[in-house]
Amino acid sequence: MSDLHHLSIAKLVDGLQNQHFSSVELTDHFLKRINTLDKKVNSFITIDEEGARQAAQQADDRRSAGDNSVLLGLPMAHKDLFCTKGLLTTSGSKILHNFVSPYDATIVSNIREAGAVCLGKLNMDEFAMGSDNESSYYGAVHNPWDLSRVPGGSSGGSAAAVAAGFVPFATGSDTGGSIRQPASFCGLTGIKPTYGRVSRFGMIAYASSLDQAGTFGRSAQDCAYLLQPMAGHDARDATSIKRDVPDYVADLQSAAAQADADKPFSGLRIGVAKEYFGKGLDAEVDANVRAALKQYEELGATIVEVNITDPEITLATYYMLAPAEASSNLSRFDGVRFGYRCEDPKDLADLYTRSRSEGFGVEVQRRILMGTYALSAGYFDAYYTKAQKVRRLILQDFKNAFEKCDVIASPTAPTAAYKLDAALDPVTMYLGDVYTIGVNLAGLPAISMPAGFTESGLPIGLQLIGNHWDDSKLLSTAHIFQQHTDHHTKLSATAQESI
């Protein structure tokens, strides 16, 4: 059973249900890989071996008693901004380095109730602010495809753990591309659901109107399995929408079964915007994404030209609104109630100032300053209010585009994974999100999936964007494509290592 980490979720479910292996055996397999190989990847902040083995034994006991729930006994892990009772929840920051959550986030409790086994908490950019996972207080995460490169961010630990074969799937959060960009860099499938589809209760906030929890897996079907217990209304989250949750796995399987064998995408209109293929797009990314679109076309899809807001305008809007919300959300970390507190403060003002300046990293401080400036009395209308008006125009441009098409396709990121310690200036790093942030501003669902590789073997992602509540359609559109291609089946160098 040395290759259990190569199996899809569907095959792992089948193996557990038919007792080819137990949850304890499966959990031990993944824990052994983590303990042996994660020293060079650094994807985990906390490994909960004792809790995982207890949960695995409980899952096996439930199965022996006749419970055959789909996720029962499957190992997984959470991004470290989801509160997890009894475990460290740090959000990748020094300011929370000793914080043990007294309660579970809604998605954590939902996944636990479904029977999945949490192996621990995953590394991330500090407070989800970053695109390379180098800003974590717990050290940079390394890309399992090439350990000298970044995994993307901010959910870099989640992506790296799945790509390395440490967990079959993982949770992440996406504020401006923090699931999709790491999925692209690590050769995975990652979905950011419609805003309001998944509860944010217990998720440490970066920008509340943009944050959304989602999933990583090797395939769209893998993502669908984990998204199922996560989705749904939660009265504890004011932004959660009360709307029926589809059966994501059944929907994509049904769509695949009903599709024409030769032209499964007959009738599907894929919108392509020239704005997504302009200045700054790497030539190899461009070629692979266009090749994937050609495959969709050969499988029956119709490519139609659409127009969306210039990504540079979208980028400027995002980096006005997101830091403004972060400035407000992170004001609670003051050194008084919980988290890091400086030593021997002279007075209350010194306590606030030193606790925050010592507890927050450089990128977080930068964004707090940007946001505070945008919200200041003299500039509120000139910057924040104007950005909110532009946000409405961005949403309207997407609505206009969806009158002509069913999904919109684009590169996920302008480049493949770049080198660690590249010392990118902040603006260059921010440009890495240029194709993903519009989705968050508009509250739309989007998925990234492998579309090919560079000549040096680095993964390249294709992004599909759906209209509001078309999460299931996106999963099906990705799943059927993956039935006709094999990009998602390729394994990283770390995943191929045996122990």
From Swiss-Prot:
Its biological purpose: Allows the formation of correctly charged Gln-tRNA(Gln) through the transamidation of misacylated Glu-tRNA(Gln) in organisms which lack glutaminyl-tRNA synthetase. The reaction takes place in the presence of glutamine and ATP through an activated gamma-phospho-Glu-tRNA(Gln).
EC numbers on record: 6.3.5.7
The protein, known as: Glutamyl-tRNA(Gln) amidotransferase subunit A
InterPro entries membership: Amidase, Amidase_CS, Amidase_dom, AS_sf, GatA
Protein family membership: Belongs to the amidase family. GatA subfamily.
PANTHER family from the UniProt entry: GLUTAMYL-TRNA(GLN) AMIDOTRANSFERASE SUBUNIT A, TRANSAMIDASE
Keyword annotations of the record: ATP-binding, Ligase, Nucleotide-binding, Protein biosynthesis
Pfam families according to UniProt: Amidase
Transmembrane parts of this sequence: none
Catalytic reactions on record: L-glutamyl-tRNA(Gln) + L-glutamine + ATP + H2O = L-glutaminyl-tRNA(Gln) + L-glutamate + ADP + phosphate + H(+)
Coiled-coil region: none
